[in-house]
């Protein structure tokens, strides 16, 4: 049985647990090691099953607890792009014992889970998202920190059974909010984040490709709220003919996991 469980999602930290029948992978470790291990225990995850930690990019809300976590889950290898691994090494975030793998165009395997990456547009060294090919044949994708939804991202996540996709900010809240103009422009740029409306616009094509589980993630604490993100997404899915109930599940990833597991 496959499952994806966002342990933390948002401005303060991000970490997602993906589990299959024979192993598990952790995507990002953006909170303290204790917080992540406590969250794993809360959702019934097993740190001993984690064969790999994959990192999307080197910003602190994705790597805060990385080094202590790798010192705890010593069996886990570290997978990321060559540019991100170089940035992590320079920042002293990789323990000496940890095996690192720079992922390229190939599909890697960890704990019986296939792992591929796709390029994303964000202001980091070499950011990426990931697709996970589960032992039961399901495909799970994680794509956050997207300045823009490119054809590369669309092609990679198409056909996913479940997608964790960024819905970072409400445009009106951001424009009217207290952030400096320069920061607002950075967030709205092609190297920033994906708005609720931009996220919602992508969901109908995902639905057509077979996606039935949608998780809205990385919501801004100051420039968004779950009801706005859900409303934008629900409207476009309904217009696209999505059925409710178990046929099409739409969730918002909470800042701290509330026990919700998808799939």
Residue ranges and their predicted role:
Residues 1-43, 128-145, 162:
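Conserved beta-strand hairpin/beta-sheet module of binuclear metal-dependent hydrolase folds
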Residues 5-15, 52, 57-64, 76, ...:
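Structured catalytic core of nucleotide-sugar glycosyltransferases
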Residues 82-137:
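Metallo-beta-lactamase
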Residues 33-80:
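Active-site metal-binding motif and surrounding structural segment of the metallo-beta-lactamase
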Residues 151-252:
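Cap/insert and terminal regions of metallo-dependent hydrolase folds
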Residues 27-30, 50-58, 79-82, 141-144, ...:
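Active-site neighborhood of phospho(di)ester-bond hydrolases with catalytic His/Asp-centered motifs
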């Amino acid at each position: 049985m496959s499952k994806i469980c966002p342990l933390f999602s948002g401005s303060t930290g991000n970490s997602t647990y993906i589990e299959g029948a024979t192993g598990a992978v952790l995507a990002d470790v953006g909170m303290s090691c204790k917080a992540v291990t406590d969250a794993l225990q809360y959702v019934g995850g097993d740190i001993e099953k984690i064969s790999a930690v994959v990192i999307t990019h080197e910003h602190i809300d994705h790597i805060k607890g990385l080094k202590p976590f790798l010192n705890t889950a010593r069996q886990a290898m570290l997978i990321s792009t060559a540019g991100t691994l170089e940035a992590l090494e320079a920042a002293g975030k990789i323990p000496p014992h940890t095996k690192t793998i720079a992922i390229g165009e190939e599909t890697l395997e960890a704990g019986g889970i296939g792992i591929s990456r796709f390029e994303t547009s964000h202001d980091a060294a070499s950011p990426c998202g990931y697709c996970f090919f589960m032992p039961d044949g399901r495909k799970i994708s994680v794509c956050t920190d997207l300045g823009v939804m490119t054809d590369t991202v669309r092609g990679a996540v198409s056909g996913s059974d479940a997608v964790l996709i960024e819905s970072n900010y409400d445009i009106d809240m951001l424009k009217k909010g207290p952030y400096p103009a320069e920061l607002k422009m950075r967030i709205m740029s092609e190297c920033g984040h994906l708005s609720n409306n931009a996220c919602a616009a992508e969901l109908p094509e995902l639905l057509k490709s077979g996606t039935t589980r949608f998780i809205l993630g990385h919501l801004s604490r100051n420039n968004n709220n779950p009801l706005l993100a859900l409303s934008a997404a629900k409207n476009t899915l309904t217009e696209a003919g999505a059925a409710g109930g178990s046929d099409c599940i739409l969730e918002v990833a909470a800042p701290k996991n509330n026990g919700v597991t998808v799939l």
